[in-house]
Amino acid sequence: MRILSNVNLMGLLIVLLAAIFFCFHNVIVRILYSQQNILGIWQVGGFVTPTLSHSFLLLLLRMLWVVPLMALISQRLYGNTWREINQLKQPVNRPVIWEAMGCGFLMFLYLVLLYISISFIPTGIAITLFFTYPIFTALLAWRLFNDVPSLLRWLVIGLTLIGTFLTIPYAYGGEQQTLVLGVSTGIASGIVYAGYTVFAQRSFQRLHPVPFTWISFATTLILSILCLIIWQPHEGNLPWLAITIGSLLSALFTLAGHVLNNWGIHLIGASRAAIIGATNPALTVVLAGLAIQESLTNIQIFGVCLVTFSIALLNYEKVSPSTGKNSLK
């Protein structure tokens, strides 16, 4: 059995830490929407009600932190960030900036849908539904680029659909409408994110991921402002200090997750990092259970594990045929 090198092991741990940071962000969003029992000790949360305008508000406050912080560290992540952004002003590069801004719109849309989903259903379930996106990515790639799914990929799609079905909560009475909304927006966020990944991958051929990501964040910020002008929250007395702190923590965990994930990709490659990243639904369930005592049924836990296994298997298929090519230099 081959022993992992120090670089490989470090890369795996870094990507795993990035996934944990993303899980913290998901739990924080849940706390902002509904009161939770933190570590079984004290009650906190429920600062905003689960409405469309509040989703815009939370996304706006998050991006108000993320955009300037990303601008500060972007030069360290990629030395030509601002030079490439300035070059986008040239008429010949207009299609590139429009592509990046279009992906920014998709980022805005999938984040709003995911926020709505988390506000209505348990965090782990919302993230599991979101992580069905590789199914739609495979179907989009088949439709747009004639990338016919392999037999293994069809098997993964089937397992993911079964896991998703097992994960969906069922209730009766007044909760049914909110559950339907939470489940549908969770799946919809995955569909939109699939489109984002497909078009982003195409944009990376002409624009580096770091300036591309900053443009997407900035576009999301602008769209959040515009939507908040149209759909203003009706409540005039919100706990702004708590919301601001929660948004700052959300931004820091998000940004740290992105930076660590990119670092891990540099060490072990994107495909291997994606296999570790596929554990996000299971990690979110564990973290939500420990931090806010969020519980799922045994069938739902099995569904989460099945989706996690399926996505990891799909990512393994991508790395397996080219293991030799992707070996570290």
UniProtKB/Swiss-Prot annotation:
This is Uncharacterized transporter sll1319. The keyword Transmembrane helix applies. The keyword Transmembrane applies. InterPro entries: EamA_dom (IPR000620). The chain crosses the membrane at residues 9-29, 53-73, 105-125, 126-146, 154-174, 179-199, 210-230, 240-260, 273-293, 296-316. It comes from Synechocystis sp. (strain ATCC 27184 / PCC 6803 / Kazusa). It is found in: Cell membrane. It is a multi-pass membrane protein.
